[in-house]
From Swiss-Prot:
Membrane-related topology note: Single-pass membrane protein
Major localization listed first in the record, in broad terms: endoplasmic reticulum
Function: This enzyme is required for electron transfer from NADP to cytochrome P450 in microsomes. It can also provide electron transfer to heme oxygenase and cytochrome B5.
Positions that bind NADP(+): 298, 535, 596-597, 602-606, 639
One term of GO molecular function: NADP binding
Record organism: Bos taurus (Bovine)
GO biological process terms on file: nitric oxide biosynthetic process; response to hormone
Protein name: NADPH--cytochrome P450 reductase
Amino acid sequence: MADSNMDAGTTTSEMVAEEVSLFSTTDVILFSLIVGVMTYWFLFRKKKEEVPEFTKIQTTTSSVKDRSFVEKMKKTGRNIIVFYGSQTGTAEEFANRLSKDAHRYGMRGMAADPEEYDLADLSSLPEIEKALAIFCMATYGEGDPTDNAQDFYDWLQETDVDLSGVKYAVFALGNKTYEHFNAMGKYVDKRLEQLGAQRIFDLGLGDDDGNLEEDFITWREQFWPAVCEHFGVEATGEESSIRQYELMVHTDMDMAKVYTGEMGRLKSYENQKPPFDAKNPFLAVVTTNRKLNQGTERHLMHLELDISDSKIRYESGDHVAVYPANDSALVNQLGEILGADLDIIMSLNNLDEESNKKHPFPCPTSYRTALTYYLDITNPPRTNVLYELAQYASEPTEHEQLRKMASSSGEGKELYLRWVLEARRHILAILQDYPSLRPPIDHLCELLPRLQARYYSIASSSKVHPNSVHICAVAVEYETKTGRINKGVATSWLRAKEPAGENGGRALVPMYVRKSQFRLPFKATTPVIMVGPGTGVAPFIGFIQERAWLRQQGKEVGETLLYYGCRRSDEDYLYREELAGFHKDGALTQLNVAFSREQPQKVYVQHLLKKDKEHLWKLIHEGGAHIYVCGDARNMARDVQNTFYDIVAEQGAMEHAQAVDYVKKLMTKGRYSLDVWS
């Protein structure tokens, strides 16, 4: 048994050994196969990936080269580049004028949108002989860069690039009624110097509250002699008229390829695709358009735009931008006085084939479309337009007057101020008053600036109205010194936008949302003090709606105070019922209304602020309250700010200078916010 058991055991051991050996061999074979397959797959996969990777690298390289403005300047023989930061088109217009000036000095210039180029390329600019970078930089809102200059601003803040050898000059566009007057232009000028660039002429400060055109002309007439002296060049002659675009008339054009008012992509209004922005606005349906006031002297209105299915998101305090259309009667009058067929399909093509800007507005299109949707025909034209138009005045006196107004002489500046600006003469009025002035319509379309979007503070909260954006506006209409009646382009156009009726017609508004820093505090318990006379109440309707919504959600909400001003309670008390309802429900802690014309002595919002000075100081100093001011920048905002200086000085027992510093620190911390206009 023992032997049998031993034999049996031996046999079992051998069998186990054989099994172990068998599985080990199988494992090795399988492992080898797996490794082989994986290796082959990996190599195969890698090869397959190398093709798109290589293509991607080529694309990136090409893209980088396209964004090199220095390479473009070398290729096209230019040595002056004029960058513009523009929100309303004025800075871009000034940049174009400066780039055209260059030819008078044997130089070649180009205007450039900083958004389209890599500004790190500035360090390579000295590779071009007698190269100069000019910056026409507007300031938007409260010291912010314009949308197209935001990336440039961010780059300047982050970079430490050496700009030694770079020559530059800056002209800033701003408004002195704003707290941060010309902040962007001043920053660019200072920062470029810090990075080693050489300023060849003093910073220019344009003030739109005064005469921006005169500020620019005065700076420009001193700037070019400084450039000549620096580079050792001389002017080649008098300023001459040089066409930038050539006319092409289309006699047999497929209408499907013709622009009919789109801002960017052809047929974008027929085939709407997000995201929606300045170059791709959303066509919103007007669902509500009601008059807010009882009086007949002015028309104040509340509109609601449907943004369902647009994927547009907004927050209380944001702005809505709308693209208006010019009055068809004005357009028709222009066509008649120029003897032009407005329905001709045409294109204006840039004579500079290397330019990024192929057309002054979307082409091909008709003159009617251009004058209705693309060109500004209601603002007084600038001096460069008058200079170019003068050649078409056949009557010597009219020709002389136009050239004089376009000159930099004191007499010319005074005449332009009085005859054009103060009289608010638009292009049609000038053509009517100068009968011999009859320019070709295509040249006029080349000269007129682009019609710009108008911005309105959104008068709703997305928490309550996620599918609609509300606008509060006053229709502008006034008589000029010449007896003409001028109307606001956008507000008159909005006023006529009737909601869909029984006939099924829809009133549409091209729009997009622009983000703002005008925001409610992060903590709902933080008290808010809102000051907004007239249509300045608009963003506060959204703020109050949001605070009311938070209360309905069971959230604890801090004190909400509104200081609102209007003329009379029975004339222009906007959102009267809504505000009374919020006050009754407790969402609005205090509703303080100043009526400026209801009693012999005028009462303004600042008077009501002084009346509540003790409580306001407690909310600000102890409660961490946030202050918001919306409305007129020239008078109201300044007076309100001075009132807060007085309150802080008196209640905080401070000297005036200390009180000013206290309020300025509130601004720096985001506790004193402004949404103002002039």
